[in-house]
Amino acid sequence: MLKKVYNFVPDNAISNEQIIYMTVKFFWKNLSVAIAAVSLICACSDKDDLGPNTNGIPKRGVMQNIVERSEFSNYIDWQTYAGDDFYRYATGAWQDVTITKPGKSTGTLQEQGRLSEEYISKVCQEGTIPAFDRIFKAFSKDDMSKNVQILLNKLRDIENDVTNEDEAWKKMAELMKEGYTAPLDYGVWPVRRKVYPALISNKNFGHTDGEIVGIFIKDQDECATAVRTARMFAKLGQEVDVAKWAPQGRCATGREEEYVVIGGNTGGTRAAGLPAGSPTRKIFEALGVSDEEGMAAFAGYEAFDEEFQKSTVKELKGLLKYAVIDRDAKFIGAKNASALLESVVEAYHNPLSLILNRHYSETQVPAENKARVTELSELCRKAFAARLENSPWLSSEGKAKAKDKLQKMWIFIGWPSSWEENATVKVSSDESMSAYQLVCDLYKQRASVFVPAFKGKTDVDHIMQTMMMSKPTYDANAVYNPINNCVYIYASNLIPPIYDPSKSDAYNFAVMGATTIGHEMTHGFDTGGSKYDATGNKKSLFSGQDNSVFLTKAGQMADHFGNFVYGGGIKVDGVKTVGENIADLGGLNNAYDALMGRVGGQADERLYKAREYFRAFALGWMEKGDNEYMQRTYDTPTNVHAPNFVRVNGNVYQVDAFYDAFGITGGQLYIEPSQRIRIW
């Protein structure tokens, strides 16, 4: 029964005996609250009490909860005062009956992720997509020795073809065109709403260990050199990535875009061209990209260029051999066709991404959900614009710039209105090719098909599809991209547990509106997004007094969140998480205003809807995991998010409407009105 009531209790997390025990414990613990609720219902029995408790607002100075019927009653811990710990109040009943395995977690976002993984597993196991079916039929364990020999031949070619640095740069470009991370990927990426051929960093590069590499490179010294060199470049990429989040002055940290334009019309982003004779320049030329059309490049390419120049020919050959093994060893070692397909799909920038994106959009998400969420996004935009206009601290010039950026912001919902038909990779019909060879051929098409189909495009649909190649719409995520000033709401958000057409407006405005759409919109105005203007140029949105006040408020947010503790005593890094926390608070405010714009009726009805909205906001961030999970997930240099309970408690107590809705006049987390942080 509880598994039906609590949608996010994982099937393998709790036994029947535990369910019985926790059920008895839960109802015994909440017996007094149940009696109070029954008394309240009896007292109001002469009324239509299907909605708010119209007489339940506590008197000033009286700290007690409003006990009423709620869409979310199954999650609420009525014994916890909403002014003491709202996250516990809104999700405590669920927390009490949910048991997770050591080091694991469950919750709303975890459920979204589980559904995404379930979809991928299903399509890979069933082979219902034509391209997948062809690979299914071609797979045979008898091809193992043939496949190993093919890989060994590739390593032999690297050994024979690379005798100096210039040949190494050419071989890098050749392997990139074949879909290898050597040590960057070659594809397409949009910068300021124009798609360029691109050198793309790959966060998954460098994970193959020396034992596997040693299967294909028998010489121990050569194997060690290959692994060491590859790990160095992988670490370099990670260091560049971490540097994006490093503080640059008081609370100036934020999401930095990782691509710039080399050559072509740079629009002031970066000086055109590269030093003559530099490795990156030679790779650039070997890829066949002209200076006139330009190339989008990973912002850390200069650091790669420096390391290229310091590397010996032996090290460069080792790097190239490692690149081949790093990608292909898992394909060759797959036990069956499903495992092979999952390895391909899980790879970063995989060639089947657009096929999967389209299939997911057409089979998993009702079209009407996209229309409803699109409408919701425009309501949030309208509410945000009103808040900008009424901002008490922005100057007239600052308001005009902010509203212009918001108005020009693209909001991608789910999938494009039309797909680029010339961007479909095709699986070869050659019956002599093994499944591994078919996959390698698909990777070659990533450059030969995607680059000509997308380069130079400037329209919404092509920009969106370009982003979908590395940010697939079936993943559990949503992003804001500053150099294109666009929000991308993945299609996985258009179904439960995020957008749920069977639930109330309060739920959908909170979970889809606040934690997703409003959150991503506000990223355009956080400590990172505010460094970019309406057209994606790296030019501060605010100046003078506006910028000074904004950074002061960001500093207040950093200090406030730095007071929270998690995972057995770890303090939240308020500076590292400030951009996400600003986005959370902005989304919470904007979606609330959007909801209130839809709610008519009496003041009591509006207060009831407000309470339901804030309760749903907590459900959107609902999560349970032990200290091991919390430490592993949040105590890392690249995770810029605070733990979910902090994202709730750190923000709701900043909002005046929250206090009004629940009649809160005190409590452990109460913040005096004059001390509440008001940004967006």
Question: What is each stretch, according to the model?
Answer:
Residues 5, 9, 16-32:
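Bacterial N-terminal signal peptides that target proteins for export
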Residues 38-64:
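Bacterial Sec-dependent N-terminal signal peptides
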Residues 59-91:
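N-terminal module-boundary/linker segments of secreted carbohydrate-active enzymes
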Residues 81-84, 89-145:
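Active-site-surrounding "flap" and adjacent substrate/cofactor-binding loops of secreted or lumenal enzymes
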Residues 81-83, 191-195, 472-475, 482-484:
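Short, well-ordered loop/turn elements at secondary-structure boundaries
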Residues 101-127, 221, 239, 244-252, ...:
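Short secondary-structure subsegments characteristic of cysteine-rich extracellular domains
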Residues 119-380, 416:
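Noncatalytic, helix-rich "gating/capping" subdomain that lines the substrate-entry/channel surface
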Residues 164-170, 375-514, 518-680:
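Zinc-dependent metallohydrolase catalytic domains
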